[in-house]
Amino acid sequence: MRRVTLYRYSVPMEAGVVLRNQRLKTRDGLIVRLQEGERLGWGEIAPLPEFSVETLAEAESAALEQLQSWVAGQAFSDALPPSVAFGLSCAQAELDQHLPQAADYRKAPLCSGDPDELFEMLQAMPGEKVAKIKVGLYEAVRDGMIVNVLLEALPDLKLRLDANRSWTRAKADGFARYVAPSLRSRIAFLEEPCKTREESREFARETGISIAWDESVREADFRVEAEPGVSAIVIKPTLVGSLARCQQLVKDTHQAGLTAVISSSIESSLGLTQLARLAHWLTPDTIPGLDTLDLMQAQVIQGWPESTLPLLAAEQLDVVWQS
């Protein structure tokens, strides 16, 4: 006997979370609970505004159609919006006990704001020092100066930077001018510095600063391949699609000799813990990019270890549909 519950959550965000052109006041998504006999499987469907191709309403419509078919004994379709494909495939994998329980709860802290506070936090970080900084929000020159100061002050620090394609080539060069050439190798990667792939490639070749593909991974013409100056592929399952698609991307990335990084699209704690399990399974040697929980004011159903945020139980969520 197959049974389904589809829930909707809406969690208030901390002030100041801006996605491209809009301030995100709440994080809204769907939680799927599959049941077959005694077995349970959970999944999260949470398109990210400004980044996902599908809206939450479109995702809900697609999920409802699939879940009704699933209850009737059908398998989930392969042709689904990415967030729906990811959430349903996670729930199915949990149900079938194919998603390992072991998780990688290490996270590259997402840093923003005051360089002095940043310095104190990074200095106190145990083990491998890897942090992520969003660049491109302020002046490129300021970004370059902060990166340079941090790398100079903390000799064992590696930085992951993310520009979200926000720079012209001239601005990207302005950033690079303020990072000493001797420190550039400790930038693990800079995600998509320029507005076009070709400009980003040229930037990497000419500055010696490694880049990573992120937005490009979701474009129809993208192929994983080794090329000069590219060191990593950032995989955001909510934006990419099913577990099978993520597995294939990781495999292709490793075969090309590149680093694969599993990364968050600001999922709830339930989705984040599943991403931590996925990272432990598929990319055990790489710290995942999952430091987004503190952007929210509550957790959902499954808590993240050591988080003190309040936890919403399933009973506190709205039920969209139940079989």
Swiss-Prot record:
Keywords: Lyase, Magnesium, Menaquinone biosynthesis, Metal-binding. Its EC number is 4.2.1.113. The keyword Electron transport does not apply. Pfam families: MenC_N, MR_MLE_C. Pathway: Quinol/quinone metabolism; 1,4-dihydroxy-2-naphthoate biosynthesis; 1,4-dihydroxy-2-naphthoate from chorismate: step 4/7; Quinol/quinone metabolism; menaquinone biosynthesis. GO terms for biological process: menaquinone biosynthetic process. It comes from the Bacteria. It catalyses: (1R,6R)-6-hydroxy-2-succinyl-cyclohexa-2,4-diene-1-carboxylate = 2-succinylbenzoate + H2O. Converts 2-succinyl-6-hydroxy-2,4-cyclohexadiene-1-carboxylate (SHCHC) to 2-succinylbenzoate (OSB). This is o-succinylbenzoate synthase. It comes from Pectobacterium carotovorum subsp. carotovorum (strain PC1).
